[in-house]
UniProtKB/Swiss-Prot annotation:
Belongs to the THOC5 family. It comes from Arabidopsis thaliana. This is THO complex subunit 5B. It is found in: Nucleus. Keywords: mRNA processing, mRNA splicing, mRNA transport, Nucleus, RNA-binding, Transport. GO terms for molecular function: RNA binding. Component of the THO complex, which is composed of THO1, THO2, THO3, THO5, THO6 and THO7. It comes from the Eukaryota. PANTHER family: FMS INTERACTING PROTEIN (PTHR13375), THO COMPLEX SUBUNIT 5 HOMOLOG (PTHR13375:SF3). GO terms for biological process: mRNA processing; mRNA transport; RNA splicing. One of its GO terms (cellular component) is THO complex.
Amino acid sequence: MEDGEIEEGMVTADEFPTPEVTTIETIQPPREPGKSPLELLRESKTSVEEIVAKMLSMKKQGNHKSEIRELLTQMFLNFVNLRQANRAILTEEDKVKAETERAKAPVDFTTLQLHNLMYEKSHYVKAIKACRDFKSKYPDIDLVPEQDFFRHAPEAIKDQSLSSDSSHVLMPKRLNFELHQRKELCKHRARLEQQKKSLLETIAERKKFLSSLPLHLKSLKKASLPVQNHLGIQHTKKLKQHNLAELLPPPLYVLYSQLLAQKEAFEESIELEVVGSLKDAQAYARQQSRKDSGMSSNTESSRLEDDGPDDDDDGQRRRKRPKKLTSKEGSDKAGLYQVHPLKIVLHIYDDEIPDTKSLKLVILKFEYLLKLNVVCVGAEGSQDGPEKNIFCNLFPDDAGLEPPHQSTKLILGDGQTFDENRTSRPYKWVQHLAGIDISPVLLGQEAHNTDPAKSDTFVPDLSLYRQQHRVQTVLRRIRLRKKAHLALAEQLDLLMKHELPVVNCEDAPWALHKVLCALDSWLHIQSSASKSCSLTLNSVEQVPEPMEIDVDGRSISGKEDFESIREDGELPSLVTAAASLTSSNHTPSKVSNQARSRQLALMTKNLDSPISKGKSPSFKKYEDDLDLVLDDDSEIDEPTGRTEAHVEELCPEKADNSWVDYGSREFALVFSRKTDGGKLWKLEAMVQISMEYPLRPPLFSLSLHASSSSGNENGTNESDHYNELRAMEAEVNLHMLKIIPSDQENYLLSHQIRCLAMLFDYYVDDPSPDSKRGTATTVVDVGLCKPVDGKLLVRSFRGRDHRKMISWKGRGCASGYPC
């Protein structure tokens, strides 16, 4: 808007309309008496907005200047109305404030009265609480209950009006009864004092008689020796054993006391005796006492010499430096395995037979190494190698070769193990029985880990055993291990004679199956004790890549051959573990067995028996671990090769699982079967039997070969039967374990061999041609609990195979199953 226009449209006081223009003012009606100031304010505001809008529109058009003046006049009138409404609102506000001030006075008065009442109430509450908390002395007086008072109080103290008396009247009467009772007790005490004097005189006379008894008892003991030997009481022998036990070193004494307490408290089927030279033990005890007294005197004298000033050195204090050991003394290892003269011999009997002398399972000999400060145990009279050492891996990661604590490692030297030629070894559980607690040793990278949630991983598995019944747990495991090895030896003897062991189990289908194949050979190949017991991380990293590319860009890996044979994702659970059977130069037992044993190491670490099924909480963990292994293996999609960081993250324990294979034995099993067409099938199995049998089941690695009647190979390749062999391995190594009852766990090897023979018979009897074996569903694929009635069902879809192989969840055979 231009300035000229503004000046032209301004309205001054001289230009206010004359009385003739009052007709325009009458357009806006005055304030109606029924309207409130707020409504008048709103109407005036709305009218002003409308007038301003009209003036702006006329100003833009440039004409109707007379109308603009009229609108301006109306707007001023609205301003007057606005001021009038504002004045009315302020007047009403003052009126409301005055009314509020008048109403505030009674409210303040009422509030003051309320505060006074609340203060008075709090005063009364405090007074009531003080009265209630008041304690008098009479409740602390130890009086007889009221019922006893009414029952036993004499009539002189109580009267007939007691039922209506108040508690205040009753209390003095109860106090009088208490005084009466105490007087009676004082009289009774005087009588007891008289009896005590007479009894003391009698005791003195009997002590004189007892002092003369040892001479009579000594002569009586000598006379009773023939009777003791005849009755088998051996009381004198027990006293001698206790006297010998006093000369035992502290670790052996703790071991002896624990075993003896277990026998006496729970009637354990064991016998204890301390053997050795008594004179040598006494001489060693005197030598140790003189050595200890000499060390204490030398310590005191050296302390005095160190505290006294030297005259030649102007009173300056001089300390003695310890003498350095010569290299000859430091390198002398001849006396490291020096044994204490006394040993503990433990006879363990079968606890399932009532007569303890009917069957002696094993004899243990405990000895103490003086220089190494460890307790060793071994089977008495046993000169066998580690493959027959029943104490090897009695608990996880305890082969007996590693020094049990750090001081022993320092004495033996870095990287040195215990002498393997010794039959007795320092197992960790023996140290715990002897009271020698072993602290866990942290590695370099573990020492910097301060996470308390991960601190439990550093504690050895034997710490769980420390919180349980030590002696009972060890004896039970030794009995189970010995019985299992006796049953295993019986089965191995039959297999060496090329005879299949007989199993007695009605629930197992292979027990009722008539074996058609023949056992050609059973040979003992080697023992894993001769191998190295260490598995470095480099060996874990040297897993073959799924495919390698040569200079020409061609694949030179063997895994592609297997991938081309099977369908996409079919049976992926065992492909990686068994791919090295044909692609590497190692034997199947050397490669696949190690891979599978590491998978099974998790399952049997803290189990009492893998075949106890629902009878113990440990079997639930075993079934969970089986599912864990199958689920983990079934998801192998990425390449087998891993980076170093990935291996260290996912496999931190694989480098320490070499103890699993220590002491295990490997056998070669060959089944043969000749078909009607003149074709000869041979199923070769590498069987690895662990020292923890049957806790850790035997591991089977299979390979299949076929030849014609003329003896020539017919061109069959193991990859043609790859899926079936892996399914058989999974069945024999994992799934069939669920159906074996607990009373047959020691004959697990027989069940596995019988099951393998049955699967081999079914596979050979399969009428499908060789070209369709890899693409057809056989009895091996779908499981033995739901047979396919001898028919071959071709898969109707491609893609990853999510079938669960040979499930044994149902024990009953379906109709048509060839049991």
